[in-house]
């Protein structure tokens, strides 16, 4: 996994006994952002590093966001998740609320950087990162704004149920025919898996020989971001893709209804959960091919504009 990119330098910070490693990328002096503007970048779910890269799928989402922000004059901090890359700890043993506290520590570290105006800091989250960004924004009216990309406005259990239906609908007909022949239904299999996870008590468990972050799953299933969305008083940019089958666009529309601050909603046609363009049917089966493409300039430009517009700082 890549840990740095052009123009950035390593930065470490602590949360309790854990040391998290990241990259601080200064904004270009030629950018249009007000002096001292900065953003904390929080990646999505899974064992991903500061660039949003996992061993099985390198999406480089946050690396590309950081580069676009830097060009606009916005500094940023992105970091490896606990137990991933150069960060200490055990990824599988960490819960959702551990990840939230790690992000809170990252926000404090960013505000402490030289040249960063503590009152001109944004939080930008993608997928799980959007859930985390919601929690930070709900508790911090000092933020200049928050960006929620592929966010959620329902419990994790509801989101996963929607995902199961969407994935089943995206399968080729021969596969769905075979599943019916074998009397296997994806939604039913999902329910059984969730029941097993709910019955667990440890931080980690194995399901079909695969190590699973059970505590994170239990916390995610029960977590409802709605009360925190209602508590947000800072400007919000919520972005969704019409081809996202992991975070349905209706969640972003609901975010607009719940958040108390100034909210901008953007739905990008044919954008997937990986923030790539997909002209064909929405499916996770093309993720590896999608990851070879760059993140859509549309979403990068929306984020950069939001972070450099004076109205977002009021």
Region annotations inferred by a language model:
Residues 1-37:
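N-terminal cap/lid segment of alpha/beta-hydrolase-fold proteins
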Residues 105-115, 119-174:
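Primarily recognizes the serine-hydrolase "nucleophile elbow" in alpha/beta-hydrolase
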Residues 147-219, 226:
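Accessory cap/linker subdomain of secreted extracellular hydrolases
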Residues 232, 238-240:
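Short beta-strand/loop motif that positions the catalytic acidic residue
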